[in-house]
Amino acid sequence: MPRRWLLGAGVVGAVGVGAGIGAAALAGSEPGRSDEDVPEDGGARAGDAVAFRGEHQAGIVTPAQDRLHFAAFDVVTDDRDQLIELLQQWTAAAARMTEGRSAGSVGAMDGAPDAPPDDTGESFGLPPSQLTITIGFGPTLFTRDGVDRFGIADRRPAALIDLPHFPADRLDPARTGGDLCVQACAHDPQVAVHAVRNLARIGFGVVSVRWSQLGFGRTSSTSTEQTTARNLFGFKDGTANLKAEQPELIDDHVWVGAEDDPAAAWMAGGSYLVARRISMHIETWDRTSLREQETLIGRDKGEGAPLSGGGEFTPVDFDATDAKGDPKVALNSHVRLAHPDHNDGVRMLRRGYNFTDGSDGLGRLDAGLFFIAFVRDPRNQYVPMQNTLARDDLLSEYLLHTGSGLFAVPPGVHEPGTWLGSTLFD
């Protein structure tokens, strides 16, 4: 089986030696690595490394890669120092792996033969594949069942809410929530899986995997150099998504400002990650006429142009009518209800992926969209928009939300001696 096929491997925890914060990654890649057969994407070689350190975490405005491994973790200790040490170890390991190196300083093959390796080895010989690792904190990290386990309850951001129940939610508790999250994106699925697997290994005894999701075929472009991808309904998805080349809009809608929440000033330069596992009623959709599909979406299926006319990127004319005087873009179409003009100007940076998880006992495909969005404040952005879509969007008849999570993504690591989350625990 070609290694580029999406792997079905889950995360396996094993006892290992964590990479200390002092084990900073060195420039370069492992011996024998080659990116000659890795396709280009977003104007750069897909085998290249993406800088881990910076003002913001990578994996947000980074050009969206083709593959995803997302995992939510529960912290299984109440020891604050152990949690801090883990975040330091994760920072060091993430810095190494995003450069195409092993998770630990010794590697998978060069350690003591009677000790477990400090890397699992499945990415040895592979290029970095533009791997990014993005880490966030869930509401239950701050308080769980009313208990302030780590002395940070008073630093919980007001925007880090417990998401409300939406119509069409059928959330599985086993696919919902989490104290921590890790988003690993790469152009090679084996590289993404390797990243999450090794962070889980390093965290053995401190964290356990609560749930995880593999994704393929990005459903949004986050750069003007990327083409618009298609979702499993067959339509282009994310035509109007925010782009990295729009810094003013990114500042307004994605990055948390220094004055947004005085009690959570540690989040300045960070963002909020909304994750939703959305199952699609694929077989029902496949029996729906093309005309009805396009009416529900509000765009044509080929080019992705709005039904009001023009090309893919032509602004939607919501006032355009047909010969009968009916709106060309239906009042309950997805593109109308999700448009900023009908949501008080709200915009989000979407970074989702398609998924398939086999089939059920009736032979129906378990597939859909793993929705990811980065927002400055979910209370003012995601929640009102999702309420509107769940209530009025006819496309919701073909969708079922089965998993959910909201995470505070702290700013990046750019000062010497800092680590992901250091602003929270200072």
PLM regions: where:
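Long, histidine/aromatic-enriched segments associated with O2/redox biology
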Residues: 5-426
